[in-house]
C-alpha cells in the first residue's frame, strides 16, 4: 500500500498527530504504514534483533525504536533490515542511527531514522518491548498506527485508509 501523509492529514485532521520533522528516509519503500510495535533501548539493539527474527511477526506492523536519539552507534544494519523484510515488517522508525545505508535503500522495507553511523551497538539484552515511547513531540502507543513517507511521519489511534 502506498501512503501519502499530506492526504491523510487532510482527510483525518482530528485523528492524526504529526511527528516533529527530524527523520530521513533510508529504506527501499517510499512510504509505509501499519500497527505500532515499540522497542525502547539505548545503544543496544538486542530487542530489535529479537523482533525482526520472529517469522511473520511483523506482518502489517511498524517497529518504532526509541533509541534515545543517540548518534553514537547504529541500531539497524543491512542484515537486520533484510530479516525484517523477510518477516513481513512494513517499516521501522528509529529514533537513532542506522548503517549499511546503500543496502538498506535496496531492501523492501520502509526505514526512517535520524542519521547514519558506521559503528554497531553493544548486545547486552537491555531494553523494553511494547511500552509507551515519546519522542518527536508525540507518544507512540503499541497497537496504534503509524504512516510515513518523504513528507513526514504521522500517528493515529486507528487504521486510516487513503482517500479517493
Swiss-Prot record:
Family of the protein in this entry: Belongs to the class II aldolase/RraA-like family.
Class of the enzyme per the UniProt entry, highest EC level: lyase
GO biological process, one term: regulation of RNA metabolic process
Complexes and interactors: Homotrimer.
Protein name: Putative 4-hydroxy-4-methyl-2-oxoglutarate aldolase
Stored Pfam families: RraA-like
Chain residues that bind substrate: 77-80, 99
Keywords on record: Lyase, Metal-binding
Cofactor annotation comment: Divalent metal cation.
Domain of life, source organism: Bacteria
Residues that, per the record, bind a divalent metal cation: 100
EC number per UniProt: 4.1.3.17, 4.1.1.112
InterPro entries reported in the protein's UniProt record: RraA, RraA/RraA-like, RraA/RraA-like_sf
GO molecular function: 4-hydroxy-4-methyl-2-oxoglutarate aldolase activity; metal ion binding; oxaloacetate decarboxylase activity; ribonuclease inhibitor activity
Listed cofactors: a divalent metal cation
